[in-house]
Amino acid sequence: MSLQVSAVPIKTSTQNATSAVKRHSSTYHPTIWGDHFLANLSHSKIIDGSIEQQFEGLKQKVRKMIIDLNNEPCKKLGLIDAVQRLGVGYHFKSEIEDVLQKVYHDYSDDEDDLNTVALRFRLLRQHGIKVSCAIFEKFKDSEGNFKTSLINDALGMLSLYEATHLSIRGEDVLDEALAFTTTNLQSVLPQLNTHLAAQISRALNRPIRKYLPRLEARNYIDIYATEESYNTTLLNFAKLDFNMLQELHQKELNVVTKWWKSLDVATKLPYARDRVVECYFWMVGVYFEPQYSFARIMMTKIIAITSLLDDTYDNYATGEELEILTEAIERWDIKAKDALPEYMKIIYTTLLDIYNEYEENIAKEEKSLLYSVYYAKEVMKRVVRAYLAEVRWRDNCYTPTMEEYMQSALLTTCSPMLAIASFLGLKEIATKEAYEWASEDPKIIRASSIVCRLMDDIVSHEFEQTRKHVASGVECYIKQYGASEEEVIKLFRKEVTNAWKDLNEECLNPTPVPMPMLERVVNLTRAIDVIYKDDDGYTNSHIMKDYVASVLKDPVPV
């Protein structure tokens, strides 16, 4: 991207006449999707009444398969894993929970198959059961190293590798296992058959714990079909489920795209990123299940308007204009728009309209839950206050300390705001007490924010310094501690790893709030890992094109 300085005539409340204001703004590429999702993308030729009837029949067969596992649960962990990775576990939550509880209570320590032990550990931890990592000590030799014989068990090493990503702080054996499996899986990769090599290659780049559920489902459908022991009923059910959900997602995206088109962002706010499709993809990552349809639409609107706010504060508006905008958002009153420049009025009125729409929907369904919108508004106000603080630093050429920077930057990731907004879709599960908890910077939301902030800084700090922009965490750390860029990035990556461990720990029973709330935070963090792992995939959306297409555009062949 290139740096562009544009002189745009605007009128503000402090100017009686229109005058040219020099603005430093980056030139972002336009949406790569055009009007694609405005078209009718129905799967009508694939999904009709007879297919839905077939789907229900397959669903009951899969349910029976899972229930029958109670007879020999420890031998059937692979089926539970497949059901979940194929993305259909949400149909059978109670049945899976029953099987895993039996697996947990019936366990004996005489199992010496690495794949079985590691798979059991991962599945139980994924469900909040705090099993001990000491079970992996028996795979070490007399010198305390993992046995070299394990190198010949590629499937077992892969299973152990995946299990290590459920670790918490202080579990040294899992840290050692991660180093051992990463090194040796990379070493044996060229010698393996195509099927297993593909799984390992994908896992080394995207472990299950950090992968978005929809992407994992689409990826694993192809992998599962090549396994010798695959179940035809389960595979066909997963394919139909994926396509039926994709049809629903396309209809929602069509609604969102029409709404976005009505705002005419590309013309009226040309300095901003036009990324509504990527915003929707992000929210499908947070919750993909059909019951969250309205929540997905509203969350997409929230993240899209937040993106406009981000670009306005970060990339276009003057400090004076932003003081007025921040004050208006603090007031949260439509009358406050009168003090804003014309281009800001679009953003401000849209922001209020989105939350009003959410409020009206909740009032229709359950008035007692209206408190939830209050918390969503309040955290948005915190975000714009933090945006403004960073603008003041930028305009005063001030490099904050890391402590100052992180206090603001963890808010401007928007992770706390998106977490609290995502709880709106959970309705009565998210109680007033749970919102209070979420508003007090709990460990899991802070950890998610750290992952987002540091991963974003690692991939974008060089570009950010090519324009007038607040110092990133990398520059703040270098100035405060005299470290090299390489040292800072290494440290940040370690902090991201530790933050994931904190996320994992907060998801172990007993949990501070219901698990569905924690799952939203985990999924938001997974989205960050996908978007920012190697580059800024939101700004440079070509990077995410294949991901978006696989989930939202291209059906699974049936």
Swiss-Prot record:
Instruction: Please provide the Gene Ontology terms (biological process) for this protein.
Output: cadinene biosynthetic process; diterpenoid biosynthetic process
> Which InterPro entries does the entry link to?
Isoprenoid_synthase_dom_sf, Terpene_cyclase-like_1_C, Terpene_cyclase_plant_C1, Terpene_synth_N, Terpene_synth_N_sf, Terpene_synthase-like, Terpene_synthase_metal-bd, Terpenoid_cyclase/PrenylTrfase
What Gene3D superfamilies does the database record attribute to this sequence? Farnesyl Diphosphate Synthase (1.10.600.10), Terpene synthase, N-terminal domain (1.50.10.130)
The answer, when asked if Lyase is one of the entry's keywords, is: yes
What SUPFAM superfamilies does this protein map onto? Answer: Terpenoid cyclases/Protein prenyltransferases, Terpenoid synthases
| Catalysis: reaction(s) | (2E,6E)-farnesyl diphosphate = (1S,8aR)-delta-cadinene + diphosphate; (2E,6E)-farnesyl diphosphate = alpha-copaene + diphosphate
According to the record, the segments passing through the membrane are none
Q: What class of enzyme is it?
A: lyase
| Key words, A-Z | Lyase, Magnesium, Metal-binding
Q: How is the cofactor bound?
A: Binds 3 Mg(2+) ions per subunit.
Chain positions recorded as Mg(2+) 3 binding sites: 464
GO MF assignments? (+)-delta-cadinene synthase activity; alpha-copaene synthase activity; magnesium ion binding
Return the motif ranges for DDXXD motif.
310-314
Which residues does Mg(2+) 1 bind?
Answer: 310, 314
What cofactor is needed?
Answer: Mg(2+)
**Origin: domain of life:** Eukaryota
- The residues the record assigns to binding Mg(2+) 2 are 310, 314
Assigned protein family: Belongs to the terpene synthase family.
Relay the domain remarks: The Asp-Asp-Xaa-Xaa-Asp/Glu (DDXXD/E) motif is important for the catalytic activity, presumably through binding to Mg(2+).
What function does the entry list? Catalyzes the cyclization of farnesyl diphosphate to alpha-copaene and (+)-delta cadinene.
User: What name does UniProt use for this protein?
Assistant: Alpha-copaene synthase
Species of origin reads: Ricinus communis (Castor bean)
